[in-house]
């Protein structure tokens, strides 16, 4: 966020480079993404995949609904190499980087709420969901009133076939929130492994 803050002289060089390199629309999108764009460390990604391998997951249709530059795709285990990869990324620059890095993946540059994947289409939904105390506008889920992280978790669950797996990083508020509606939704639709 500091590189977007004109009031911080120690970041002036970075600020000027960003302004020069990006269109006004790209600049605003990049600045906005500093609020909730968090990239997952390779250690965490490998641990998630190790758990999936231990559960017997061998591949299939894999969804990463907030894929960033595609780190989950880049660290896909060899045992899952024949999988069909689907990614969604809201940020245009980040999404285009992912498309260049993983040209065989189907990566949509849009919000998860705008995707048209059929429920039950995926064998696995994996990722690091965006965190925040605000809602995403999705007519299918608005009535539930979920925060963005709980929205992602619940929609990921719906997108996975019966017997499929959802594996994701989320904030503590998914399990610790006073409002138990998202936990109930997840418990009714899936099984904690």
List PLM regions with ranges.
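A short SAM/SAH-binding and catalytic strip from SAM-dependent methyltransferases
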Residues: 126-135
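Short glycine-enriched, charge-decorated loop/helix-capping segments at active-site entrances
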Residues: 139-144
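Class I S-adenosyl-L-methionine
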Residues: 1-101
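Conserved beta-strand segments of alpha/beta enzyme cores
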Residues: 84, 105-106, 191
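Conserved SAM-binding strand-loop segment of SAM-dependent methyltransferases
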Residues: 104-112
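A short acidic, Gly/Pro-enriched loop at the edge of an enzyme's catalytic core
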Residues: 116-126
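Conserved Class I SAM-dependent methyltransferase catalytic core
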Residues: 48, 88-92, 145-193
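Conserved ATPase-coupling elements of RecA-like P-loop NTPase cores
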Residues: 135-138, 178
């Amino acid at each position: 966020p500091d590189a977007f803050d004109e009031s911080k002289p120690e970041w002036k060089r970075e600020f000027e480079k960003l302004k020069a390199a990006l269109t006004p629309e790209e600049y605003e999108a990049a600045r906005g993404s500093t609020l909730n764009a968090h990239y997952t460390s390779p250690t965490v990604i490998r641990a998630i995949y190790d758990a999936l391998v231990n559960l017997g997951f061998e591949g299939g249709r894999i969804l990463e609904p907030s894929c960033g530059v595609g780190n989950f795709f880049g660290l896909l285990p060899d045992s899952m190499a024949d999988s069909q990869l689907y990614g969604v990324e809201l940020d245009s620059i980040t999404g285009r980087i992912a498309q260049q890095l993983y040209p065989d993946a189907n990566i949509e540059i849009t919000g998860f709420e705008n995707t048209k994947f059929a429920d039950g289409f995926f064998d696995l939904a994996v990722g690091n969901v965006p965190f925040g105390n605000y809602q995403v506008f999705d007519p299918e889920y608005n009535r539930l009133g979920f925060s963005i992280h709980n929205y992602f978790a619940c929609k990921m669950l719906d997108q996975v076939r019966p017997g499929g797996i959802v594996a994701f990083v989320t904030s503590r508020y998914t399990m610790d929130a006073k409002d138990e509606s998202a936990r109930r939704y997840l418990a009714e639709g899936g099984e904690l492994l």
